[in-house]
Curated annotation (Swiss-Prot):
Family: Belongs to the HflD family.
Chain segments annotated as transmembrane: none
CC annotations in GO: cytoplasm; plasma membrane
Disulfide cross-links: none
Protein name according to UniProt: High frequency lysogenization protein HflD homolog
Stored InterPro entries: HflD (IPR007451), HflD-like_sf (IPR035932)
Bilayer topology annotation: Peripheral membrane protein
Keywords recorded for this protein, A-Z: Cell inner membrane, Cell membrane, Cytoplasm, Membrane
Subcellular localization: Cytoplasm; Cell inner membrane
Name of the gene: hflD
Length: 204
């Protein structure tokens, strides 16, 4: 895959996690296939996109979100963008804290080697959520999630959100490994939209 294609798909993976977070906070549910793919990316150590995400189908939610971000922004997508920017900032802080980074890497390796459940199983999600809470959750400013209180007060939903935020950090790391930078969006907007259109065509 060419460089811009890799960067676009990696950026879509960030927006996918934040879209799923927003879906959970707003409705208590999220797209199952994209959720599975994003959570699975946490325990996939490769920097090759085709190894982290098996197909474009794994990133449909993220690709759709990126198209909206680059097109006509809605009020809902603005929240998704804010979460994404917060994750990019949080990942930058994490990269400056080697102790915390080592702790997260070690715990993810343990989860990968010891987990008997599917990554989207409640037990696995709870472990990922606890890892996020005990590490990244302590960095300021914390990511504040907006949504319906009935869902945000549900333990399983909050665990799920934290697990997806961890997946979001993984997505940011993947995006940066592909040379992704926020200013690229300004100069490559048309190319990215054309690329998204071609990806959508492949999915039909």
């Amino acid at each position: 895959m060419n460089k811009l294609r890799n960067q676009t798909l990696a950026l879509a993976s960030i927006l996918q996690t934040t879209t799923l977070v927003d879906q959970l906070a707003s409705t208590g549910a999220c797209d199952a296939n994209s959720n599975q793919a994003s959570l699975k990316s946490i325990i996939t150590s490769s920097t090759k996109l085709e190894e982290v995400f098996n197909s474009k189908q794994d990133l449909l939610v993220g690709i759709a979100a990126l198209k909206v971000v680059l097109g006509n922004k809605t009020k809902r997508i603005q929240q998704v963008i804010l979460y994404a920017l917060a994750l990019i900032n949080l990942e930058k802080k994490l990269m400056k804290n080697q102790t915390l980074l080592n702790q997260i890497t070690l715990e993810i390796d343990l989860i990968k080697n010891q987990e008997f459940f599917e990554i989207s199983h409640a037990n696995s999600v709870a472990r990922l959520a606890q890892l996020y809470k005990s590490t990244l959750g302590g960095l300021n400013p914390r990511i504040m999630i907006n949504g319906e209180q009935i869902y945000l007060s549900n333990k399983h939903t909050t665990n799920h959100i934290r697990a997806l935020l961890l997946a979001g950090i993984r997505a940011v790391s993947l995006w940066k490994s592909q040379g992704g930078k926020t200013w690229h969006l300004l100069f490559n907007k048309k190319k990215i939209l054309n690329l998204i259109s071609s990806l959508e065509g492949l999915n039909k």
